[in-house]
């Protein structure tokens, strides 16, 4: 199947516009890149993780035997879990601009993370000297030590065995907080994508 060969991760986006909880339904086994991205972008908020057994029609099709696409579901309140669902009250009053915007922001983060989630490897042995590469701050501020620490922690785990999400999870930051660090390290050729 051509889809399976060409899709590395996808998201079923449904019921995304209300102001209630966020929800996530994994792929059949919950071990795909789509699952990893979904859990990472939702980890900083209160969300409900459902079992694949709580799936709906779309999940049944995308993840069925023989199809097995790596597509996870991200939504606000899961279909069937809000009182207005499939009643005459299930209308545009259920959604809101802030709910839609919040849903949009999460999906945007998921796509950005998919695009930037690579395996990185440091190009030098041992801990690199940051100062001669212009990566060490020349003025000490309240945040400069923490910034250097995150960069050094990233470098420690950029061994080619961990992707960006793995590293972010290991060092306890959001992957998006590493985007700028990755760009800086790539610019001075301290890391490479493998």
Model-found features: residue ranges?
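Helical lid/core segments from catalytic subdomains that handle acyl or acyl-like groups
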Residues: 40-45
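Active-site-adjacent mobile loop/cap segments within catalytic or ligand-binding domains
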Residues: 56-118, 165
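Long, charge-rich, low-complexity alpha-helical segments
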Residues: 146-194
């Amino acid at each position: 199947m051509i889809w399976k060969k060409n899709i590395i991760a996808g998201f079923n986006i449904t019921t995304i516009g209300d102001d209630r909880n966020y929800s996530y339904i994994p792929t059949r086994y919950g071990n795909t890149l789509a699952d990893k991205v979904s859990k990472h972008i939702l980890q900083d908020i209160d969300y409900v993780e459902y079992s694949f057994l709580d799936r709906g029609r779309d999940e049944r099709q995308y993840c069925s035997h023989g199809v097995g696409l790596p597509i996870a579901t991200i939504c606000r309140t899961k279909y069937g879990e809000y009182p207005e669902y499939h009643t005459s009250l299930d209308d545009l009053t259920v959604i809101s601009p802030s709910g839609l915007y919040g849903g949009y922001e999460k999906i945007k983060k998921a796509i950005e993370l998919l695009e930037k989630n690579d395996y990185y490897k440091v190009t030098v042995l041992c801990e690199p000297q940051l100062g001669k590469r212009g990566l060490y701050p020349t003025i000490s501020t309240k945040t400069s030590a923490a910034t250097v620490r995150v960069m050094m922690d990233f470098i420690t785990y950029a061994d080619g065995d961990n992707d960006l999400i793995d590293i972010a999870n290991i060092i306890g930051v959001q992957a998006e907080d590493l985007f700028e660090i990755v760009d800086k390290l790539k610019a001075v050729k301290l890391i490479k994508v493998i």
